[in-house]
């Protein structure tokens, strides 16, 4: 009891042994190898990438760097709770735009919520927790309608689950 009936695959055992030998080391805080690989995959420079310990950390970092004081942030409601948490933690005023009946995004209302003080618009696409998404045409309209002072943050954590042809 308590033991598997099958032996561990040799390749797996060797990989685990190699990793365990370095377990006492801190990871590269700048993620140089990962940064280079992702940049090469997407055809961008490594300096265009930021990595963190999950989206919560990155959302908090974005909020702290790009919004503060009398600035303003826009996001949907309901949507990923970390947008609200980051704003409250940083004492940044925000507008949470209600989703439409059926929990669809209200792109016109999102744009209407933007003020001269707005610096960030968070869009969880597809939305967490509802799964609603903004299709390609509506997303292009949203992004091209935002003032240049507003940074759109597209949180696409669940994009791989969307199979709709109009999702970009």
Task: Explain the meaning of each model-derived region.
Residues 88, 105-117, 129-168:
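Active-site pre-lysine segment of PLP-dependent enzymes
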Residues 14-17, 68-69, 91-93, 137-141, ...:
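Glycine-rich, phosphate-binding/catalytic loops in enzymes
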Residues 7, 59-62, 83-84, 130-131, ...:
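Glycine/Thr-rich phosphate-binding loops of Rossmann-like dinucleotide-binding domains
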Residues 65-123:
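PLP-dependent aminotransferase-like
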Residues 1-56, 61:
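N-terminal small-domain helix-loop-helix segment of the aminotransferase-like
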Residues 27, 50-51, 97-102, 129-132:
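Short, flexible loop segments at the rims of nucleotide/cofactor-binding pockets, characterized by
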Residues 45-49, 70-72, 117, 149, ...:
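Short acidic capping loops at alpha-helix termini that bridge into adjacent secondary structure
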Residues 2-5, 55-56, 80, 125-129, ...:
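Short glycine-rich anion-binding loops that position phosphate/pyrophosphate groups of nucleotides
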């Amino acid at each position: 009891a308590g033991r598997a009936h099958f032996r561990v695959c040799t390749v797996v055992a060797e990989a685990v042994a190699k990793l365990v030998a370095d377990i006492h080391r801190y990871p590269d805080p700048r993620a140089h190898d990962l940064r280079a690989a992702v940049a090469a995959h997407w055809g961008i420079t490594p300096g265009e990438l930021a990595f963190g310990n999950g989206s919560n950390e990155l959302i908090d970092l974005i909020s702290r760097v790009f919004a503060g004081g009398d600035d303003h942030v826009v996001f949907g409601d309901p949507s990923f709770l970390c947008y609200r948490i980051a704003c409250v933690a940083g004492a940044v005023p925000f507008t949470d735009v209600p989703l439409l009946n059926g929990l669809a995004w209200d792109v016109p209302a999102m744009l209407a919520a933007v003020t001269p003080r707005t610096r960030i618009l968070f869009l969880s696409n597809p939305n967490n927790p509802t799964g609603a998404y903004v299709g390609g045409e509506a997303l292009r309209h949203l992004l091209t309608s935002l003032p240049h002072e507003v940074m759109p943050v597209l949180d696409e954590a669940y994009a791989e689950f969307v199979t709709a042809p109009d999702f970009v």
